[in-house]
Amino acid sequence: MEIKPIAYFSAPFKSKFGVPRQSGVVKGLRGKIRFEEEYVKEEALRGLEDFEYVWLIWEFSMNERGNSLAVRPPRLGGNEKVGVFASRSPFRPNRLGLSCVKLLSVDSEKGVLEVSGADLADHTPIYDIKPYVAYCDAHPDAKCGFVDDKEWKLFDVIPSCLEIDRKLADTFSHEEIDALFEVLAQDPRPQYHKKSNPSRSYGLLFYDKDVKFHVEDDTVVIDDIL
């Protein structure tokens, strides 16, 4: 079977650094799905506006194909290995991702969906979209392996000074600032950096800006916006 993208994703992230590790964890993060020309037809999207969430099947296009059958999930601190099929690792044999996102609007005429809570970088190819159906998709009492035993701690996020606070307000909308803070609260650093170089400075490409930050204990400090 050969498959080709039906759409591409527009997101604030121009690189994979900072992209949320799971869909739904940064609920304020908005993006747009732009369909390829052959699917910009009312009949293709008819009825989709009646659903609140959709599933996206997409490609980890910024990652190489994974060759290892065991991976180190961030949830386990990068110390323990599990099988690749027992993880959400982006380094997979077929590089396919699966995400559930909230559907905010449907523009059938332009072939654009606006969604929130996605974990996709900009220009990610999307291969299929399916509606989320609660009666068969939701399993709130399901056990979730190592995820049940490892709570993900959110960090505090602060500007380094009043000047940076003002710069944030001048650069981004209130909605974008909220989303940025949600992203940084997830601590986007690679696991191995947290031990080898905890005071290192980082740059997060968010929209068309480079957000500089470092981490002090459990706090992300925004140092500049370039």
Language-model features: where?
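Arg/Lys-rich, positively charged N-terminal/basic patches that mediate binding to nucleic acids
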Residues: 1-42, 48-50, 134-183
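Basic, Lys/Arg-enriched alpha-helical interface segments
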Residues: 48-54, 153-210, 214-226
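Active-site-adjacent substructure of cysteine-protease-like catalytic cores
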Residues: 44, 48-97, 192-198
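Short, conserved beta-turn/loop elements at beta-strand boundaries and strand-helix junctions
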Residues: 14, 106-113
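Residues located in well-ordered beta-strands
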Residues: 8, 99-104, 114, 125
